[in-house]
Amino acid sequence: MATASFDSAPGASRALPAIEKAPEVTALSTLPGRKASLVGLTREGLKQALIGIGVPERETRMRVSQVWHWIYVRGAREFSEMTNVGKGLKAQLADHFTLERPEVVTEQVSRDGTRKWLLRMAPTGAHDHNRGAEIECVYIPGDDRGTLCVSSQVGCTLTCSFCHTGTQRLVRNLSTAEIVAQLVVARDALGDFTGQMPGKDGGEPGRLVTNIVFMGMGEPLYNLDAVIDAIAVMSDQEGLALSRRRITVSTSGVVPQMERLGLEANAMLAISLHAVRDELRDELVPLNRKYPIAQLLDACRNYPGLSNARRITFEYVMLKGVNDSDADARALVRLLKGIPAKINLIPFNPWPGSKYECSDWERIERFSEIVFTAGYASPVRTPRGRDILAACGQLKSETEKLRARARLMLEEGMGAEAVYADQVD
């Protein structure tokens, strides 16, 4: 049975976790001599790109609208497809820019239809070793929706003990364009742009991607500027056209940024709670040492737009013998009193090296029953994509996995030649 080891005994001083500053990239960051892609830019970013190649400012509103439509409604891959854009401007655009998406390094499809893409971003400089940072995003098809789980950072700084991504060091923040491009890649793969041929999922009527959750790699509120701008692009009704009520941002509890998220993004909020006592949450979610449960829930009660129609989702991973007792369930109900909320119970998804086990199904059902009886919706999240490590808490970029394997080979006495052969095999 997995148990938590506490590093904050009652009465002891609460050490604050060091929060690593993530390197930034700008919207058009790229290596010298490499054309930047326009895919993922905001309206303002696209305007500045056009002005930069000589488009008169008086024409930019019309030109931005034209190019915007081709990128975000039609899913254009070449400027030559833009039939209502003049030949001269198309030539200028092609001389200076591309419509490239991030490279799809691998695509894995689970037995349940979940898809995971490993994406390599365009190289931007020394902080990604001129190779291009890699992230993962996941598409989860459902009966009445299709949810895309997107990443906001390369790696993560929070080191949550039950989360695979937390074992990968933080490399850098993703730009707005890199966040939006994950949705563009998904729509490409699914044939989900207007006028495209049906994708691998059969081209069902309506949009295949209906919901976005910022629950991939990284802490979104530590990259809030880019996340807010990405939500604006995703929800623009003349483009990707998602409803903001179908966009959910999950945070481990960066309390000072929560109000701004609600005011500027108007997105749905999810909280990675996972414990009802500070001493346990300090271990599971070390950020709790900086923003303990009382502060976090106070920020939730004051979240802009909070109502019964816009409830906060509290995520609670079920860990056997750690946080799954009847007493924990009753304490959870008491903590959330007065907050319009639902509680997502998440069966723990195992990953190599984890010290935890998933609660027994009977225990999960009992926990859910207690919460539901108290008046809170308490669905048990169906694990999706476990067989391809695409489920909640399992994402970790392939680059980091390969580096870890290389270190292990060297520690076992295998030479550099063997490591190189393994990496390129």
Swiss-Prot record:
GO molecular-function terms, A-Z: 4 iron, 4 sulfur cluster binding; metal ion binding; rRNA (adenine(2503)-C2-)-methyltransferase activity; rRNA binding; tRNA (adenine(37)-C2)-methyltransferase activity; tRNA binding
Stretches assigned to the Radical SAM core domain: 142-381
Pfam families in UniProt: Radical_SAM, RlmN_N
Binding site for S-adenosyl-L-methionine: 218-219, 250, 272-274, 349
SMART domains: Elp3
Alphabetically ordered keywords of this record: 4Fe-4S, Cytoplasm, Disulfide bond, Iron, Iron-sulfur, Metal-binding, Methyltransferase, rRNA processing, S-adenosyl-L-methionine, Transferase, tRNA processing
Source superkingdom: Bacteria
Keyword Ion transport tagged: no
HAMAP family associated with the record: RNA_methyltr_RlmN
Chain's role: Specifically methylates position 2 of adenine 2503 in 23S rRNA and position 2 of adenine 37 in tRNAs. m2A2503 modification seems to play a crucial role in the proofreading step occurring at the peptidyl transferase center and thus would serve to optimize ribosomal fidelity.
Note: Reaction proceeds by a ping-pong mechanism involving intermediate methylation of a conserved cysteine residue.
PANTHER family: 23S RRNA METHYLTRANSFERASE, RADICAL SAM CORE DOMAIN-CONTAINING PROTEIN
Family label: Belongs to the radical SAM superfamily. RlmN family.
Protein name: Dual-specificity RNA methyltransferase RlmN
Lineage: Bacteria, Pseudomonadati, Pseudomonadota, Alphaproteobacteria, Hyphomicrobiales
Gene that encodes it: rlmN
